[in-house]
């Protein structure tokens, strides 16, 4: 089993005729992702990389049966693209776009309440189920099938963690980038719940960063509900208060959201934390050995 997407997932690309979308569409197709449609208003009838282009999400869904969309639309128009995907009742929309205005996302989040469409992102690397389906911008080759779930606010730290695991012979089920913006769709707890219920996932790596309280809330949820070992890492440990570190959501304000606070809460809830990015893999191995599942996690031929 996998989380959110698998080899049978039919995907549409919103904004497919843009240069960034074209580049990543080719990468996703090469990985084996079933991209069945593209959407660019006014460009319906074209074919790019063998993928038919439609004017609307509704039309693309009806013609191809796509259930998931990935958005590479420029920031000023991205919120409308998410709303269009939700109106078409897609199962999931993965928004890669960065710099969407916060107020736009507040409206989107409100609009999605009570609807079936799950939003992942924005400002995220996407979702990948190893060796099956890649939706987003992550480097596919570092991901290998196995039993560790990865959930992260940071794209590049996801790649770092996955690469370390693969190098150690430890494969992954699904890696989910939830994005670095202050207002997003899917949060840590949503993904942790999915991993907890997934038979194939035996352990989880959770990567957070300064700003907000998402990691603290996740830690409390892990303590109360999680039946599998979780290890963590918090980015931004050297950040001074009030200084944004990369992501829009990565800022310490009002004394809240510090790395120190987050690490303390995670540790108190039984989550082992890596001190540096280079120790994420070894921290997971340590936790797996303690849980008696290390041998089970060795699925990649080194």
UniProtKB/Swiss-Prot annotation:
Chain sites annotated for binding substrate: 159
Family to which this protein belongs:
Belongs to the succinate/malate CoA ligase alpha subunit family.
Source superkingdom: Bacteria
Q: Which InterPro entries match?
A: Cit_synth/succinyl-CoA_lig_AS, Citrt_syn/SCS-alpha_CS, CoA-bd, CoA_lig_alpha, NAD(P)-bd_dom_sf, SUCC_ACL_C, Succinyl-CoA_synth-like
> What is this enzyme's class at the first EC digit?
ligase
Q: What is this protein called?
A: Succinate--CoA ligase [ADP-forming] subunit alpha
**Which EC number(s) are documented for this chain?**
6.2.1.5
Enumerate the active-site residues. 247
Which UniProt keyword terms apply here? Answer: Ligase, Nucleotide-binding, Tricarboxylic acid cycle
Where, by residue number, does CoA bind?
17-20, 43, 96-98
């Amino acid at each position: 089993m996998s989380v959110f997407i698998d080899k049978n997932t039919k995907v549409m690309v919103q904004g497919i005729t843009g240069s960034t979308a074209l580049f990543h569409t080719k990468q996703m197709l090469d990985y084996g992702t079933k991209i069945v449609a593209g959407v660019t208003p006014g460009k319906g009838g074209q074919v790019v990389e063998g993928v038919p282009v439609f004017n609307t999400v509704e039309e693309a869904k009806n013609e191809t049966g796509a259930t998931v969309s990935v958005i590479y639309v420029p920031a000023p128009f991205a919120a409308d693209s998410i709303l269009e995907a939700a109106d078409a009742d897609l199962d999931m929309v993965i928004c890669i776009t960065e710099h969407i205005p916060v107020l736009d996302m507040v409206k989107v989040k409100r609009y999605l309440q009570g609807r079936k469409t799950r939003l992942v992102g924005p400002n995220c690397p996407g979702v990948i189920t190893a060796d099956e389906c890649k939706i987003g911008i992550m480097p596919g080759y570092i991901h290998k099938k196995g039993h560790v779930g990865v959930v992260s606010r940071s794209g590049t730290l996801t790649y770092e963690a996955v690469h370390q695991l693969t190098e150690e012979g430890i494969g992954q089920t699904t890696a989910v980038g939830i994005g670095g913006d202050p207002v997003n769709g899917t949060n840590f707890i949503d993904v942790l719940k999915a991993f907890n219920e997934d038979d194939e996932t035996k352990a989880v790596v959770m990567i957070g960063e300064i700003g907000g309280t998402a990691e603290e809330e996740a830690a409390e949820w892990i303590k109360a509900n999680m039946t599998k070992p979780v290890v963590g890492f918090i980015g931004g440990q050297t950040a001074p208060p009030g200084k944004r570190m990369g992501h829009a959501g990565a800022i310490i304000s009002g004394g809240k959201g510090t790395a120190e606070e987050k690490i303390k809460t995670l540790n108190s809830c039984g989550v082992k934390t890596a001190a540096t990015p280079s120790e994420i893999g070894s921290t997971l191995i340590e936790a797996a050995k303690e849980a008696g599942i290390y041998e089970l996690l060795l699925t990649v031929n080194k």
